[in-house]
Amino acid sequence: MRTLWIMAVLLLGVEGSVIELGKMVFQETGKNPVKNYGLYGCNCGVGKRGKPVDATDSCCFVHRCCYKKVTGCDPKKDRYSYSWENKAIVCGEKNPPCLKQVCECDKAVAICLRENLGTYDKKHRVTMKFLCKAPESC
């Protein structure tokens, strides 16, 4: 089942260390990250760029900008460690500096998505790229 979930995430193109990011989003929001955020708005998912459609989509925009600041590793592929302690994400102490940055980016987007659950709109669950307005710069 885990392999099937990973394949689904890869096919939809969710950025970040797929397993960790997906777990964080689920832990913080209680939502399936692939179904609910894989194609959401103009910034959630790979290859999507554009003016955010709402606060939820803005979380993904900020996440993309956070990844642009990471140097020394591939935030889309390299894995890191983290734990879920007392309903809070804790990035692993033994992560190298680059992966600590990636973990913090992923933690921030997961928390942002939780904090903006009230702005989540099912009509934006599948937004086609051509409908997005010119992207904003970080």
Swiss-Prot record:
The record marks 122, 125 as: Important residue of the cationic membrane-docking site (MDoS). Expressed by the venom gland. Homodimer; non-covalently linked. The record marks 129 as: Cationic membrane-docking site (MDoS). This is Basic phospholipase A2 homolog promutoxin. It is found in: Secreted. Gene3D superfamilies: Phospholipase A2 domain. The record marks 128, 131 as: Hydrophobic membrane-disruption site (MDiS). PANTHER family: BASIC PHOSPHOLIPASE A2 PA-11-LIKE, PHOSPHOLIPASE A2 FAMILY MEMBER. Disulfide bonds join 42-132, 44-60, 59-112, 65-138, 66-105, 73-98, 91-103. Residues 122-133 are annotated as: Important for membrane-damaging activities in eukaryotes and bacteria. One of its GO terms (biological process) is phospholipid metabolic process. InterPro entries: PLipase_A2, PLipase_A2_Asp_AS, PLipase_A2_dom, PLipase_A2_dom_sf, PLipase_A2_His_AS. Snake venom phospholipase A2 homolog that lacks enzymatic activity. Exhibits potent myotoxicity causing myonecrosis and edema in the gastrocnemius muscle of mice. Is also able to stimulate the release of IL12 (IL12A-IL12B), TNF-alpha (TNF), IL6 and IL1-beta (IL1B) from human monocytes, and induce IL2, TNFalpha and IL6 release from T-cells. A model of myotoxic mechanism has been proposed: an apo Lys49-PLA2 is activated by the entrance of a hydrophobic molecule (e.g. fatty acid) at the hydrophobic channel of the protein leading to a reorientation of a monomer.
